C-alpha cells in the first residue's frame, strides 16, 4: 500500500482538501486497497479543529465531506508515509527543516502536477474570498489525478 501525506501550514484548508480530493480519485478507480492518504500542518495552532468552514462549504459543493481534524506533522510521519506532498515552497522548507536525519522520504510540490492550470503553488485561501477557496479546489481537482497517475506508474 502506498501512503501519501498532504501538508500545508495549518491543516485546515489546502492539505485537508487535497487529502479528500486524492481519496476521491483513489475511490473512483477502486484503488482503496492500494493507497492511503492523510494530511497534516506545519503548525499546531488549529490542532483538533475541523477544516475551515469556508473550505468545508466549497468542498461540499463538489461532493466532498471534510471530516479530518487538524494535526501537526510529526517526525514519525517521515517514516510512516511513502510520499509527502507540500502545497508551496514554504511548506517544503518547513518539512525539510523537520526531516529526521537520514530520512529520504520524497517531498514534492502538488503544483508540479497541475496540467490545466499554471500556478507555481497551491495558494493559501485562508485570508481570501470564497472564490479563492473554489480556486484551490480547481487546482486540487487538476493536480491530484495526475499525482495518482504518476504513483500508479511506479
PLM region descriptions:
Residues 83, 89-154:
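Phosphate-binding/catalytic loops
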